[in-house]
Amino acid sequence: MAKTPVRARKRVKKQVVDGVAHIHASFNNTIVTITDRQGNALAWATAGGSGFRGSRKSTPFAAQVAAERCAEIVKEFGLKNLEVMVKGPGPGRESTIRALNAAGFRITNITDVTPIPHNGCRPPKKRRV
């Protein structure tokens, strides 16, 4: 009995005009995810996945490269306007927003969604180097 060839389904590129850029900037890495208004991920990129390893992942330039890679993928969807949500204290916060702006997106608003505990969990002990 002959096997039927498995056909790879072609992803239909839907047209999205408005999107949300979620930037997670930690001290060690920066993750950029661009979604539509409903929260469905269109593209994502990280500083580590962009070819930076070790301490170079936590640089503003690595975050900028990750944002540029993400913007490149999302251009195919016809995205024009971006709402930016930044989470975390990392060094890639500002450079990521600048890179998205330079990529040609109109940034409608920037929101800081860093979680701040109301005296929740005990923080880790201070480093002694």
From Swiss-Prot:
The organism's place on the tree of life at top rank: Bacteria
PROSITE patterns referenced in this protein's UniProt entry, alphabetically: RIBOSOMAL_S11 (PS00054)
Cystine crosslinks: none
GO biological-process terms attached to the record: translation
Keywords, sorted A to Z: Ribonucleoprotein, Ribosomal protein, RNA-binding, rRNA-binding
Pfam families associated with the record: Ribosomal_S11
Any one GO molecular-function label of the UniProt entry: rRNA binding
GO cellular component: ribonucleoprotein complex; ribosome
Physiological role: Located on the platform of the 30S subunit, it bridges several disparate RNA helices of the 16S rRNA. Forms part of the Shine-Dalgarno cleft in the 70S ribosome.
Subunit structure comment from the entry: Part of the 30S ribosomal subunit. Interacts with proteins S7 and S18. Binds to IF-3.
Family: Belongs to the universal ribosomal protein uS11 family.
Name assigned to this protein: Small ribosomal subunit protein uS11
